[in-house]
Design a protein with these regions (language model features):
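Active-site activation/catalytic loop segments of kinase-like enzymes and analogous catalytic loops
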Residues: 143-183, 197-216
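ATP-binding pocket architecture of kinase catalytic cores
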Residues: 1-108, 121-126
Length: 234
């Protein structure tokens, strides 16, 4: 309501907690590491089970075909920002629209759910706040959860199941099962499709950064180094 202070605004509740930066939880004991991951899983499932229309968010985004629209968006960004020809990216641009996962339901998706975007209690491992909602919209909750799980691919320690077990972190199969049971959806059949889409999306994001480096508009001085790896992701 612009009339309150003359412009758009929002209210944010203060939370007294911690933001942890190491997804491998190397500075935590096994109990805390497991508790943090369990609470992240619980919080994401609770978000995805919210019915948007019951809280006045039925117009928060376009319903349906979320992954298809995202594939189109990131394909365009990749092409517009292309700095080299990558055959595997070209193949994905052609293949993904023909092999989209089935969207079982529409819910509120965060868009960038990760350990660094949640706040943990000061004296316990529970998620007390979810941060950074600028990518949130209506979409496919399963795609949102799969994007969150890319950490198990991108982080070498989390990709090591023995490391996870020794550290108290659920391995990827256990973590997916925990979530699936909460939302009552079997993710195993289309998990690889979601992973292909999300890795493509991440490659598109990184290519966009490389495009800004090419055009001289990148904000970060190390942008080119940070955005390397498009070919490996594809």
């Amino acid at each position: 309501d612009d009339d309150v202070i003359g412009t758009a605004f929002y209210l944010m509740e203060f939370k007294d907690g911690r933001v942890l930066w190491d997804a491998a939880m190397e500075d935590s004991d096994k109990d805390e590491a497991f508790g943090v991951y369990k609470s992240m899983n619980d919080s994401m499932a609770k978000l995805h089970l919210v019915n948007p229309s019951e809280i006045g968010l039925e117009d928060f985004g376009k319903p349906g075909n979320y992954v298809g629209r995202q594939v189109s968006r990131w394909s365009k960004q990749y092409v517009d920002s292309e700095t080299e020809n990558i055959d595997s990216m070209n193949c994905l641009i052609d293949w993904l629209p023909k092999n989209l996962p089935s969207e079982k339901r529409t819910g509120i998706v965060h868009g960038d759910y990760s350990l660094t975007n949640v706040m943990i209690g000061k004296n316990d491992p529970n998620v007390i706040a979810i941060l950074d909602w600028e990518l949130s919209t209506l979409g496919d909750p399963c795609a949102d959860f799969n994007y969150h799980c890319l950490q198990y691919i991108m982080n070498p320690k989390l990709a090591d199941k023995d490391y996870c077990r020794n550290q108290g972190i659920p391995v990827i199969d256990e973590y997916v099962k925990m979530y699936s049971e909460k939302i009552n959806v079997d993710l195993t059949e289309e998990w690889d499709l979601y992973s292909a889409y999300n890795l493509f999306k991440l490659a598109g994001i990184l290519q966009g950064i490389l495009g800004r480096v090419r055009d001289g508009t990148a904000a970060h001085e190390n942008a080119a180094e940070r955005a390397s790896g498009v070919r490996n992701l594809s």
